Amino acid sequence: MSQELRAIVRVGDTDLEGNKQVAYALAKIRGIGIASAYAICWKLGIDPHAVLGALPEEQINKLDWAVRNLHEVAPAWFLNRRKDPETGRDMHLIGSELVLAAKRDVDLMKKLKSWKGIRHSLGLKVRGQRTVTTGRLGAVAGVTKKKATPGK
């Protein structure tokens, strides 16, 4: 039975290349790394080295469901947003949800004027890195050479 290879497969609101292996294609989704991709494949019983575009539609639908509902498939320590401040639930965010959640977290820190929020608002390092020599802002003045006086 000759099955056609789909060039683009849509999983988790992301267009994935159909000619890549399942695990590496899934890792292109923001919020899904290579470890998460292998775990999803293992949990669903799909060969992670199979070509994504050659999978039947039912397996692609299973992959889509697992990517969207990783909190139901994986243990809590595997998720990227545990104990969400708003809901208190363990979640795994993907795509633009992940970016917006990170932005909301930073904006909340700025609003509360916590130490991290102040550092974020000033554009400084947040996680305790040294700032004596690195992370300098602004243009560099540089060194200019004096003009040689003629005749001397």
UniProtKB/Swiss-Prot annotation:
Keywords: Ribonucleoprotein, Ribosomal protein, RNA-binding, rRNA-binding. InterPro entries: Rbsml_uS13_C, Ribosomal_uS13, Ribosomal_uS13-like_H2TH, Ribosomal_uS13_archaeal, Ribosomal_uS13_CS. Disulfide bonds: none annotated. GO terms for molecular function: rRNA binding; structural constituent of ribosome. It holds the Pfam family Ribosomal_S13. GO terms for cellular component: cytosol; small ribosomal subunit. SUPFAM superfamilies: S13-like H2TH domain (SSF46946). Coiled coil: none annotated. GO terms for biological process: translation. Belongs to the universal ribosomal protein uS13 family. Located at the top of the head of the 30S subunit, it contacts several helices of the 16S rRNA. In the 70S ribosome it contacts the 23S rRNA (bridge B1a) and protein L5 of the 50S subunit (bridge B1b), connecting the 2 subunits; these bridges are implicated in subunit movement. Part of the 30S ribosomal subunit. Forms a loose heterodimer with protein S19. Forms two bridges to the 50S subunit in the 70S ribosome. PANTHER family: 30S RIBOSOMAL PROTEIN S13/40S RIBOSOMAL PROTEIN S18, SMALL RIBOSOMAL SUBUNIT PROTEIN US13. This is Small ribosomal subunit protein uS13. It comes from Pyrobaculum arsenaticum (strain DSM 13514 / JCM 11321 / PZ6).
